[in-house]
């Protein structure tokens, strides 16, 4: 059984590059895989591995400057969620492209999962999903506004174009684990919105703690690992990935004429060139060859 830990923490790292070697070495030594992002604004990522390995890595992160109060969300999987370990240096741990946004200065009001339903059902509250369009497509909260953004970078422009729709409304925001809302609520406060709320722990904590019969969640929650999606109780869902575009697809989507394993699906068949598709086919061929040798090709991640 693999333990999965999703984490983020905003703090000040004077020299993120200096933190990378020891963190990567520890993960490799303890057979922990996944992706961790380091930037001057903090750390973000999801890792998976044996219980003892995850505990060792979390203890190491909590010992980093300003990370003693690190919080994370856990789940389990009976198959490895990641094929390799990456510790990457970034300008931002979640990219919004707004240099004046600083979640360490102020954020919206945190709302516990058990209080969320009452808030979003209030007539003076507008609920905004801050995730990307392909995530929203497989699940969201009842009544939520979908900005239809392809990237979190698009959110500020969407708000500027649509803010008049939310005049005199309290704003409630949510995302997968909470990190995007740290920035989006700070952004809205900076834009003069007076009452901004966000779901503490994100969708994942809500699904973990809220019984399905009391839930306002509809569908599945997209996750950035080999589980692809989870539902209530963080139970692994029915979705797979199209490895041509990385969008979630169902088993019945694989029966459609646009689907070719590792190459295309109905979402992306018209988005890639013949040259791209030829490259994807070669990649898929190498993955299949690795499988016949009992190996896992890194491109299969």
Task: List each language-model region with its residue ranges.
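Rhodanese-like catalytic fold shared by cysteine-dependent sulfurtransferases
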Residues: 1-107, 131-171, 179-301
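Internal catalytic-core helix/loop-beta-alpha segment
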Residues: 106-122
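Short, well-ordered loop/turn elements at secondary-structure boundaries
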Residues: 121-124, 167-168
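Structural scaffold elements adjacent to functional motifs in cytosolic proteins
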Residues: 127-129
